[in-house]
C-alpha cells in the first residue's frame, strides 16, 4: 500500500507537505478513496510551524480568538498557530495570550472538558482546529460540545478539508481537494458505507483509518 504514496506540497509553501495514498479506506462513518497521511506535518516542528503560518493568515486581521481547541492530533500546529496570531505585528490578536486546549472523549464518545478548563471556553471566541474535514461530522460533534460549554465559534481550520464550509462558516485549510486535482490524479471522494461504489465493485478495503493513522486489513 505504501508504494502508492504520492507527495503533495502546499500551493504557497513547498516546505509544507502531506502524503496521500490512493485505495479503499474505511473510517467509522464513511469510505474514502485516499488516506491523507499527515504524520510528518504533525510531528515535524518546522512543518507544523509553517502550516500554522498559512492558517494564521486567514484570521490575523479579521477574527478575534481567545482559545484554540485542537482535535485529531493538531496540538503542535495549534501551539504555533496561537503564537503566530498573538505575535502578528498588525493583527487583531496582537499581544493576546491565546489558550490551546484539547478535549477528552468519554465512554459515549462525547467530547468533554473538565471543570478546571471550562473557563477557557465559556464566553470565549474559539477556533476549532482539526486534522481532516471530509463529512463534517467531527466538526458537528465539536460545535455541539462548544455550545454546551458556552463558547462562541470564531472559525474552523483544518490541515486538509474536502468541504468548503460548515453552516455558512468558511473552513480555512492548508490543503483541500484542489491539491489532489492539480496533481492530475483521481479526485477525492467520500461516501457512506452503504453507497460506496468501491464496495459495490468488489474492491477490498485496504485499511481502517482514523486521526491516529491506519491499520491494514
Regions found by a protein language model. Name each.
Residues 1-64, 211-217:
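Active-site-facing substrate-recognition patch
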Residues 2-8, 12, 143-217:
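PRPP-dependent phosphoribosyltransferase catalytic core
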Residues 57, 83, 87, 144, ...:
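Short, well-ordered alpha-helices that flank and scaffold nucleotide-derived cofactor binding pockets
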Residues 60, 114-120, 187-190:
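Short amphipathic alpha-helix with an adjacent loop that forms part of the alpha/beta core around
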Residues 63-73:
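Short glycine-rich phosphate-binding loop at a beta-alpha junction
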Residues 68, 99-102, 154-160:
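Short, hydrophobic beta-strand segments that form beta-sheet elements in well-ordered domains
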Residues 70, 128-129:
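Hydrophobic Val/Ile/Leu positions in short beta-strands of Rossmann-like dinucleotide-binding domains
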Residues 75-127, 134-140:
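Short, glycine/charge-rich flexible loops or terminal/linker lids adjacent to PRPP-binding catalytic cores
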